[in-house]
Amino acid sequence: MENKKFIRIRGAAENNLKHIDLDIPRDELVVLTGLSGSGKSSLAFDTIYAEGQRRYMESLSSYARQFLGQMEKPNVESIEGLPPTISIDQKSTNRNPRSTVGTVTEIYDYFRLLYARIGVPHCPVCGRKISRQTVDQMVDSLMALKERTKILLLAPVVRGKKGRHEKVLEQARKSGYVRVRIDGSQYDLEEEITLDKNIKHNIEIVVDRLVIKEGIEKRLADSLENVLKLADGLAFVEVVDGTPMTFSQNFSCPDCGISIDEIEPRSFSFNNPFGACPTCFGLGYKMEFDEQLMIPDQSLSIDQGAIIVPGWQSCTDEGSFTRAILNALAEEFHFTLDVPFESYSKEIHDILINGTNKSVKVRYKGQRGEGVYDIVFEGLIKNVERRYRETGSETIKAEYETFMRITPCSTCKGMRLKRESLAVTVADKNIYEVTNLSIRDLASFLSNLTLTTTQQLIGEQILKEIRARVQFLIDVGLDYLCLSRATGTLSGGEAQRIRLATQIGSGLVGVAYILDEPSIGLHQRDNDKLLGTLKHLRDLGNSVIVVEHDEDTMRAADYVVDIGPGAGEHGGQVVAAGTAEELMKNPASITGKYLSGELKIPVPNIRREPQGWLTVVGAKENNLKNITVKFPKGVFTCVTGVSGSGKSSLVNSILYQALAKQLNRARTIPGAYKEIKGIEQFDKVINIDQSPIGRTPRSNPATYTGVFDMIRDLFASTVDAKTRGYNKGRFSFNVKGGRCEACSGDGIVKIEMHFLPDVYVPCEVCKGKRYNRETLEVKYKGKSIYDVLNMTVEEALTFFENVPSIYRKIETLYQVGLSYIRLGQPSTTLSGGEAQRIKLATELSRKSTGKTIYILDEPTTGLHFADVHKLTEMLQKLVENGNTVIVIEHNLDVIKTADYIIDMGPEGGDGGGTVVAQGTPEEVAECPQSYTGYYVKRVIAHDI
């Protein structure tokens, strides 16, 4: 019975774990905390989750297992009392452009079903409501007319078509019909009827004339069947002294003659040809070449190199073919190539960009001699599109793609579905309009939905499921998102909370959920909602194990495990375990000391004064409400606000992109704004984000920071290397010479397993050391180049203490809290937070101009209190060098140390997009409208 109450872990030694023994209570909310790199993830994901998954796999048949691949057994002696495990981490976010919030949560699937079952179809051309009726329903509608009403049953055989239509009239005559109505006038079929073939005609055969009275149902039904047969399921009824009526057996518009297919759930799927827009295939957008990117500085002339797109950069050279084309165009259309591009008339501009139908004579002198060619110029955009299509090189394709931008599909306007599907409505909204509402507005729409009795009966169960799932998203603080939002644009925290909401919807019991920092990107105000969700999962009867640094989560947990005491080699032990109160009393726990207030990140005594201002005027990207925002120069600024308030739109989409375009000459298109004043005060902008420092295992901290070049120089200067004639290139694992050729310097060899995942094994020749034997024989202070790459930052610091240039570079890695990572650690194994701090360290090691503006988005992701302390010191150091630092952040320990706060809000989504408060933390704390101010006031008061 005891095994059921605890997950008993014995001898866990995965990665840096030091054979730890730990009992984690079952069916409780447990937080694993500790310094970055201390071993939390190794315990939670690489041990508990991996073993749970492996045991599940073992329970499957060998046939099923061959499709799933084998899972390594974690390095642990035993785990008892382990329930099935489900991991909700940040890395498994789906970046597929077809994946949306709606598809991930499965709410969209329910909406597809709802629209297929109770949706009202309309004509996609004229918008008229169209319905399908059986003959019985048509008879009932007509019998409901006033008794003695005279009616004519008409079969519309020709609708709006030119011609004499002799065959149609002849066929009607042969079938025994007597009268016909042409363009509103009745004719006898026995008389000679001649129609003008150049005019569009409407022809309806008069099938029957009736008076509504009891007992004519049978005749009415028979006549209607004849009408429907003649007119492909359509019937017109002329009511004498009344309104004409139209009936359709199919979904077709009587006015436009457009029919729509049977409405099914797949009709609303943008991942299915039956529902997807035929132009963009359901993506909602297209990649198109953009003039602004191809000719970024239109104040330059063509002679000065205004056109920078590949294939046309040579047009400044008089001997090139592209120049010959432009010379011919200039001669034909009377313009010159030495004036600013922006000064061309609309006509000339259009010829250059979109081409001309007129043939021009191009004189070109090439290697084969001189010739004159008649060419119809297709325009820069079409020419580059053709080059892009025809090239076989992936590298050149990638280069071309930097000149393209994503634009909404011209057919569906970004709605992803074909027009027939978008013409189906529920409560006057089509499926795109509903999924484009914020979750908050969607909940309101669903609660106020008025349906007919039939619709209510059919849709009741579907709506119940939709409402429940929408509420789960609100409960995890995502009410500002919409279902149509692509998952690739979500932050790690948002994606994780969506998956959390989906899990609650599944209602599983007796499972161990393992989460990785679900509070990322969440404002303090919404933290309670998240904690409520985690507790709800626990109360259902699940074990919830959370890797977390958030103070509120630790205090709310039933049990906290502090892993440490340090990071990397110095971590991997259980320092303390118990409730938050018990941790506070434990002198060995650094976490406990921060929780109790014994250790704290100090509030600066003085706030720096701005040295100038950078002003963004008329920002209106996404939900920004045409606002003007002033960013102070030479200080540390925090941009705060609830999730979805517009922080990223302002800082990343507008400010960074605009500065990168002007200062760094980057090919970017900023978000919508009017102007930015004060750019001349800066010389460059650097975005220190959490994207990987490299996409391949060949990239590592040593190569990224540039210290590897210095280390290779050092090895090349040794007596051994000089004797053998080795230069620094010998010590690179990227080029032939010094690397192991069996694995091309990778240290691992990929074995393709066809329908199983590829298997990577250490190279048998170099044993994973990446270099050949001769290179490894060259030693510096008794260590080979491989040994140096295998050192942790801390070890390297001691090893290179007498080499100042190398020491300085490595010291900054140590200062940002990365003492535990190895110099040669593949970039693919680094977390987002670690990658960001490597970039920060690289910037700190550079000589400062004092005119740089640094932008960071949530740099505290994955950081413990002690690491946040180090981070704030690093950011302050950047500012002390005269630079400007702008940080998007929710962490109060960072916010309270800022010189200036810009608080966005007041709410997320449509309720945001304005500046609620700005000023020093003390000034913002006094603003009653600011949610951030309320929490800043509390934290400052607590620290004084």
What are these regions (language model features)?
Residues 1-944:
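Conserved phosphate-binding elements of NTP-dependent enzyme cores
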